[in-house]
UniProtKB/Swiss-Prot annotation:
The gene is TXN. This is Thioredoxin. The active site is at C32, C35. The record marks D26 as: Deprotonates C-terminal active site Cys. The keyword Electron transport applies.
Length: 105
């Protein structure tokens, strides 16, 4: 299941709770066409990679998180491990998303 995170406190808690697991964060918005296109694929990754934590953040609902993470465009995918950001890219690129998951998990 993809976790929906609504504020910075919740985001920090998710990073801490994940420990050494990879966290993949999808920063998106309801009005963003490319975000809507990649969303089903992002959600399908949960089944394929059960040891990875998947988080979705709506930048309009959680502006504090988007600002803290320096998100400039949507969709932006950030990858965290051991409470540290290890990778980031922007754009609805399915291949790039799955390659990064495989690389960092």
């Amino acid at each position: 299941m993809v976790k929906i995170v609504g504020d910075l406190t919740e985001f920090r808690a998710e990073l801490s709770n994940a420990g050494s697991k990879l966290i993949v964060v999808d920063f998106s918005a309801t009005w963003c066409g490319p975000c809507k296109m990649i969303k089903p694929f992002f959600h399908s990754m949960v089944e394929k990679y059960p040891d990875v934590v998947f988080i979705e953040i709506d930048v309009d609902d959680a502006q504090d998180v988007a600002s803290h993470c320096d998100v400039k465009c949507m969709p932006t995918f950030q990858f965290y491990k051991n409470n540290e950001k290890v990778h980031e890219f922007s754009g609805a690129n399915k291949e790039k998303l799955e390659e990064a998951i495989k690389k960092y998990m």
